[in-house]
Amino acid sequence: MASIDNVFSLGTRFSIPENPKRSILKHATTSSFSARTQTRWRAPILRRSFTVLCELKTGSSSSGETNNSPAADDFVTRVLKENPSQVEPRYRVGDKLYNLKEREDLSKGTNAATGAFEFIKRKFDSKKKTETDKSEESVYLSDILREYKGKLYVPEQVFGPELSEEEEFEKNVKDLPKMSLEDFRKAMENDKVKLLTSKEVSGVSYTSGYRGFIVDLKEIPGVKSLQRTKWSMKLEVGEAQALLKEYTGPQYEIERHMTSWVGKVADFPNPVASSISSRVMVELGMVTAVIAAAAVVVGGFLASAVFAVTSFAFVTTVYVVWPIAKPFLKLFVGVFLGVLEKSWDYIVDVLADGGIFSRISDFYTFGGVASSLEMLKPILLVVMTMVLLVRFTLSRRPKNFRKWDLWQGIAFSQSKAEARVDGSTGVKFADVAGIDEAVDELQELVKYLKNPDLFDKMGIKPPHGVLLEGPPGCGKTLVAKAIAGEAGVPFYQMAGSEFVEVLVGVGSARIRDLFKRAKVNKPSVIFIDEIDALATRRQGIFKENSDQLYNAATQERETTLNQLLIELDGFDTGKGVIFLGATNRRDLLDPALLRPGRFDRKIRVRPPNAKGRLDILKIHASKVKMSDSVDLSSYASNLPGWSGAKLAQLVQEAALVAVRKTHNSILQSDMDDAVDRLTVGPTRIGLELGHQGQCRRATTEVGVAITSHLLLRYENAKIERCDRVSIIPRGQTLSQVVFHRLDDESYMFGRLPQLLHRLQVLLGGRAAEEVIYGSDTSKASVDYLSDASWLARKILTIWNLENPMVIHGEPPPWRKRPQFVGPRLDFEGSLYDDYDLVEPPVNFNMDDEVAHRSEELISQMYNKTVSLLRQNQTALLKTVKVLLNQKEISGEAIDFILDHYPPQTPLNSLLQEQNPGSLPFVPEHLRRESGDFVLVNHSTDVNAQV
């Protein structure tokens, strides 16, 4: 591609007039065109000054030489073939251009008078041209392309559609950023409005009820890259009228262009259409007649066939079938009529002369039935009275009435454990990841459950009880299910709260029933989740206080606990039953339950490390449709302390985001959005900062992010690199910077240079504000400054990393334990009590000394950060503009900007860009998703600008 110097060395330039509808392309005279006059060529171009470089390989001959016989691959020929022109082609004959018809007439040479006339006319034209030297003739694109082959810049808008002033106004109203009415009033009050452009209102009312405006603001002295001077505004009709009355500054109203047309009305009906319609009607009539004739013929044949078939069937039925079936039909009818006559005679004999009714009456009177019914009357009266009384009593019972009987009481006292025969929990050790230590500890239990006879022969007593403790969501219940699933034994699962009821003795009865079922089906596993609800520390242990020993609820809970202690290690301890308990509050359990013999193993289930988190993410990712471009290892390393349940929620949340965005699979952006939703919060749609507020937030966050990249690039710092920078409000934050976490060893053994580099990163937000805005800083970086102050204090007082080392002896606050459990009852006293969390220093002058040394350290690091950012001011401004445009950028984009805008890059190169907020860069994960590794084309070459 030609360089920028070659571009400005050409004699071709473009001048853009004020009228955007038409523009003039001026072609200056050069060495090869010295004998020609200045020419003009009108072409529709827009206001924007983008140019397209038409580059090709020229021949070995010089630019001043011409080629009378162009090759087949000539540039002009190829361009004209690919872009055929609507202008009639012309041919050069001598110094004159002729079209095809004129050239043919010229070649004939039959008319001598015409030739003489043309000769005299050429002489006269050449003489006039030499006298005035200012005559103009047409210059065609083919001539220009041949003359400046390979060195011509043509605006790409030449080949685009021509827009009128009204259409360009509508396009700007749609594309430009929107300005609210309040912001316009503020700008109007501060005299910042340069021009207000609107469109003329016609007599027709607006259908949408809105009116558009283009607002041109005055340029404010300062950094131009952070100022936007052109805005669009869309107001209702009433607001627009009020605003125009209030605004008294410069205005420009675009006139509506009305076109009229006068011509002859088209003939109706059209003669061609009329002839076509008549022909179609004739053809349809002929087709209809043919179809009717065919129907008559075919119908006659079908009628004849039907008549023949029906005649044959009638003759066959009358003369063949009926004579054969007639004797059999007479026989069946005679038998049926005889049976019917006999039955009717019997019915008449029974019902005549009293018949059966007289016999029933004699039996009721003389058989003793009447006397028996007389005796049942008082008995039936008593029974009916009792039934009515019970029914009335039941109708008056409360809604929460429950029937109590012996059988229901027995069923109520049963454990109702959720039993799974043959360990059908559906969970194996292969489904458990991230807690390898706990799985290794529990392998012995699985071996015992699979082969208990082997342990009995060797006299080995297996662990009777195992307590699983750890934070919520780390997999305690999952491990218990995996034990039963691996061993294939009955698994009984209950919660600690299921043993608590209103009736006395129900809890202990359920404990006995639970262990009885497990002993019958041994070997088996009993699992009680949240056992702290059942086995809380009993009252009065290790204390003399016994105020609640005679509380009924306390006695019931302690009775249930005593029954559990007996079942675990009493006189009748069941062999072959493994008891598992899970809790996240071990400090609340009774000491008698924790002693050896009851809970022989106490396994701590901790949150998974980076490798465990990666394994958990892979297990859950295998259950959903996830793109291959998603890097799960980055999430595993950047989410320390996350439990397995939270990682599972992350994958499910990412799947929901992918469905919400109509993606075919879970992409990297979906995972990032899910992480932000779970860590920071959902996007706050109702909160939208103004342009100045977004600039401040973007400057602060970019300053922090780009400082880390600069330190990694030029000082080889061992600090975190930036993953993402976002100015989208989420949760309680307006913006955020996400860093890539290092390995655990970097945080366990931090060195002084590493901590000082982190201090510079925290000070990068305020330093970036000073570089861009000067002394006009804000409190946008107050959170980073507070963290920087605390880090500087820890470097000096807690870690004692000052050189030379000075031991201050100030204990860190996290090593001080409070002297209370739970909130204080006296609220007023708790306002002024620090609960021994703050201790006086060893040296009374230590506070002043630490404050002075911290201030010196922060000031030193701040000056270094400001100097580093000033050297890379162009890259800083470019990153801020890109972040304002895209709202979120990646660390790869920051590296891309630093590569193309090295230190000491002139700021004018950025200001001369047509769109500084764009970036010709595609992140790596998007390239993997699309499978295309080609960068996006851009109208401005970044390398050429630099």
Curated annotation (Swiss-Prot):
Binding-site positions, ATP: G470, P471, P472, G473, C474, G475, K476, T477
Membrane protein topology class: Multi-pass membrane protein
UniProt xrefs under Gene3D superfamilies: 1.10.8.60, P-loop containing nucleotide triphosphate hydrolases (3.40.50.300), Peptidase M41 (1.20.58.760)
Localization terms from the record: Plastid, Chloroplast inner membrane
GO BP annotations listed: chloroplast fission; chloroplast organization; embryo development ending in seed dormancy; plastid fission; protein import into chloroplast stroma; proteolysis
A Pfam entry, by short name: AAA_lid_3
Transit pept. (range): 1-54
Keyword annotations from UniProtKB, A to Z: ATP-binding, Chloroplast, Hydrolase, Membrane, Nucleotide-binding, Plastid, Plastid inner membrane, Protease, Transit peptide, Transmembrane, Transmembrane helix
Disruption outcome: Embryo defective.
Transmembrane segments: 289-309, 320-340, 369-389
Alphabetized GO MF terms: ATP binding; ATP hydrolysis activity; ATP-dependent peptidase activity; chloroplast protein-transporting ATPase activity; metalloendopeptidase activity
Record SUPFAM superfamilies: FtsH protease domain-like, P-loop containing nucleoside triphosphate hydrolases
Gene Ontology CC: chloroplast; chloroplast envelope; chloroplast inner membrane; cytosol; plastid; Ycf2/FtsHi complex
Family: In the N-terminal section; belongs to the AAA ATPase family. In the C-terminal section; belongs to the peptidase M41 family.
Purpose: Functions in chloroplast biogenesis and chloroplast division. Required for plastid development during embryogenesis. Might be involved in chaperone functions or play a structural role in the thylakoid FtsH complex.
Quaternary structure note: Oligomer.
The protein's name: Probable inactive ATP-dependent zinc metalloprotease FTSHI 1, chloroplastic
